[in-house]
């Protein structure tokens, strides 16, 4: 997910970046403490996109590779793909988000999760919360 850097000269953002999650530079988060792993978009991505009006999710059983466009997020501002931070097989999708995309804006790290993926054995290259904070600040 490519976000503009319009806020380069503004004050640091007051973003929620939970420590227990891992992040991609494309503004996805991954919770690998559970199986299957949970994937969503960060608060930063949700804020940049604005109010979501449509989310196109893959079907359970779909194969994803790190770097694939796996979800399409549409807002009144833009249509952006979510780039998969991991490789694996989609086990579950959040149908609540498909029915009401605004759930992602309201709770991107909780009820607004997007996918649950059974991960391959490959170790994904992800960022810690502190490393991700440097990307968005």
UniProtKB/Swiss-Prot annotation:
Single biological process term from Gene Ontology: glycine decarboxylation via glycine cleavage system
Cofactor: (R)-lipoate
UniProt xrefs under HAMAP family: GcvH
PROSITE patterns registered for this protein in UniProt: BIOTINYL_LIPOYL, LIPOYL
Protein name: Glycine cleavage system H protein
Family statement: Belongs to the GcvH family.
PANTHER family, per database record: GLYCINE CLEAVAGE SYSTEM H PROTEIN (PTHR11715), GLYCINE CLEAVAGE SYSTEM H PROTEIN-RELATED (PTHR11715:SF3)
Annotated positions of the N6-lipoyllysine modification: 77
Organism this protein belongs to: Bifidobacterium longum (strain NCC 2705)
Key words of the record: Lipoyl
Cofactor binding annotation: Binds 1 lipoyl cofactor covalently.
SUBUNIT field: The glycine cleavage system is composed of four proteins: P, T, L and H.
One cellular-component annotation, GO: glycine cleavage complex
């Amino acid at each position: 997910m490519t976000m503009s850097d319009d806020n380069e000269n503004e004050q640091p953002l007051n973003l929620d970046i939970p420590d227990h999650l891992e992040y991609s530079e494309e503004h996805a988060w991954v919770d690998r403490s559970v199986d299957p792993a949970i994937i969503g978009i960060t608060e930063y991505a949700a804020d940049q996109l604005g109010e979501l009006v449509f989310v196109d999710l893959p079907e359970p059983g779909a194969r994803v590779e790190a770097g694939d466009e796996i979800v399409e997020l549409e807002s009144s501002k833009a249509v952006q793909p979510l780039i998969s931070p991991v490789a694996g097989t989609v086990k579950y999708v959040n149908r609540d988000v498909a029915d009401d995309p605004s759930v992602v804006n309201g709770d991107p790290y909780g009820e607004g999760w997007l996918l649950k993926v059974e991960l391959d054995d490959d170790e994904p290259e992800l960022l810690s919360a502190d490393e991700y904070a440097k990307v968005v600040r």
